[in-house]
Amino acid sequence: RQMCIRDRSLSGLPQLPVRLNERPVVLNTSTGVLKGKMVTPNQESGYPVVLIIPGSGPTDMDGNSAALPGKNNSLRYLAEGLAGKGIASLRYDKRGIASSASAGKDEYSMRFEDGIKDARGWIDYLSKDKRISGIYVLGHSEGALVGMAASVDNPKVKGYISVAGAGRPAYEIIEEQMAGQPEVIRNMVRSINTSLKEGKLVPDVPIGLQALFRSSVQPYMISWYTYNPQEIIKKLKVPVLILQGDKD
């Protein structure tokens, strides 16, 4: 379908509407089909493309989370804004989320590497599009770590962009988020994290921590904890842009 957006320059003066095109795209995986949308500017070829990877939890391709009220459509607006500047984009629903729900595994079988593999699959998909002059990977929140790992040793990627990505391993962030909890809770979290970092499942999780450390999600967390963004980013051989705000 075609959309029309109005671009406003820094001067605040209204500009002519920018015509762009949006079409559905699919990626076949071993567990099912991932669905997304590609937005292209109103030109035949020679434009760069940004692969937009959404953040953690039930966040869809538009940046909306089923766990939060309302819709912000942040990633959809990003795609439209990029197109207005002559930059294409591809954004997608992660496996198990929204239109890609059928590609989801059961929670116990999920691994952080699944997301990395999917991102690389989309990069391969884009690399076959002769209209594109270069592929850039953008990840938001947890998607920043996924995109970072997918860009390492990948000659098809020309640049990497982190938007509100973590600069520390996930277990450190989780423990920091517990700073306001009673000491007994903080100690339990540290103890569970120590086991998970060692690759050990924790069978007896207190009821109050089940939402975070339930048995079905522990294998995913074990795989997630092995990724340290401070070490992975050193392996990137492409230009890197890090965007971070004062508030999450």
Model-derived features: positions:
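Short, small-residue-biased leader/transition segments that mark boundaries at the very start
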Residues: R1-I5
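N-terminal cap/lid segment of alpha/beta-hydrolase-fold proteins
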Residues: S9-S45, V49
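Short, surface-exposed "cap/lid" segments of acyl-processing enzymes
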Residues: Q43-L82
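Conserved alpha/beta-hydrolase
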Residues: N73-A101
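Alpha/beta-hydrolase active-site loop
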Residues: S74, E107-K130
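Primarily recognizes the serine-hydrolase "nucleophile elbow" in alpha/beta-hydrolase
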Residues: D124-G180
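Accessory cap/linker subdomain of secreted extracellular hydrolases
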Residues: G159-K235
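Short beta-strand/loop motif that positions the catalytic acidic residue
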Residues: L236, I242-Q244
